[in-house]
Structures are given as C-alpha cells and as structure tokens.
C-alpha cells in the first residue's frame, strides 16, 4: 500500500508549480511507493504544508518556507524513509 504524502498549498498564490516540482522529485526518489495528493486553497493563505502519513513534516506557515533547499528536501525524504516499511 503506497504511503500518502499530502501537500496543502496556496492555490490563489500560484504555488501549484512548486507542488508539482516537489511531487516529481519525490516520485523519482520513491517510484511506486507514494500516493501524492496536492490540494490548493481557494483563498490566499500562503500555505505550503507537507504531511507524510499523518505527520506534518514541513510547514511554510510555521516558518519552514518553501522546499527550496536540499536540507529541506532531505528532511521530507527522511520522514518518508522512516514511514515506509
């Protein structure tokens, strides 16, 4: 059963391409192992929240910014590796 990774992003802010880049990178690293779900908000929220399983692992709202550095990506990758059987 694939591991669910959910990204809640600000649709009104135009963050969908950022979600698409993250999704492509994670699917390349974990082929067939993830169920990626992206949800854009209707209103301006500024959100870019990444949840692995039921655990929030990256939050722009809480100060993490975008997934724009290798260190931020590695934190998400590590959370996925820890959650996979």
UniProtKB/Swiss-Prot annotation:
Keywords for this protein: Antioxidant, Cytoplasm, Redox-active center, Selenocysteine
Cross-link Cysteinyl-selenocysteine (Cys-Sec): where in chain: 10-13
An individual GO BP term: response to selenium ion
Induction comment: Up-regulated by dietary selenium in cerebral tissue.
Subcellular location: Cytoplasm
Pfam families per UniProt: Rdx
Record's keyword annotation contains Lipid biosynthesis: no
Protein's UniProt keywords contain Cytoplasm: yes
Major location (coarse): cytoplasm
GO molecular function: antioxidant activity
GO cellular component: cytosol
Matches recorded under Gene3D superfamilies: Glutaredoxin
Tissue specificity field: Expressed ubiquitously with predominant expression in the pituitary, spinal cord, sciatic nerve, cerebral cortex, cerebral nuclei, thalamus, cerebellum, muscle, cartilage, trachea, gizzard and artery. Weakly expressed in pancreas, testis, ovary, kidney and veins.
Cited NCBIfam families: CXXU_selWTH
Family: Belongs to the SelWTH family. Selenoprotein W subfamily.
Reported function: Plays a role as a glutathione (GSH)-dependent antioxidant. May be involved in a redox-related process. May play a role in the myopathies of selenium deficiency.
Protein name according to UniProt: Selenoprotein W
Species of the source: Gallus gallus (Chicken)
């Amino acid at each position: 059963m694939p591991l669910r990774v959910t990204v809640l992003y600000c649709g009104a802010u135009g963050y969908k391409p950022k979600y698409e880049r993250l999704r492509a990178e994670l699917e390349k690293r974990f082929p067939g192992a993830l169920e990626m779900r992206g949800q854009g908000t209707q209103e301006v929220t500024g959100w870019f929240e990444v949840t692995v399983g039921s655990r929030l692992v990256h939050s722009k709202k809480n100060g993490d910014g975008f997934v724009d550095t290798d260190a931020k990506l590695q934190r998400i990758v590590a959370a996925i590796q820890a959650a996979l059987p």
